[in-house]
């Protein structure tokens, strides 16, 4: 499912320096299964994506080392943000990755691609966002 852009800011906190595109629809990640994706459609950004594209992810999972996480650009180019690690038994991936996407046109459908590569633990994409 696609999400719409929303501007963040207000109060005493300065607004972010860029425009935020977010998807808050949950996507279940099958245990030791095929990769799943969650999409956001970016529009209204001139030119290419930045060299410091911020990718915020909130993934609930009972063994985060099982997960491989990629950002997929509108042209299909894939940027690996997290590889699997059998030693990482902690829960959840709640972080922001910085991706050099400066060769990519900003506008279009971007995807977060997540795959669980080991058995016994499950989870879901809770939300994710791109900040331009």
Segments the model singles out, each with a brief description of its role:
Residues 9-132:
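Loop and turn regions of beta-sandwich accessory domains that flank beta-strands and are enriched
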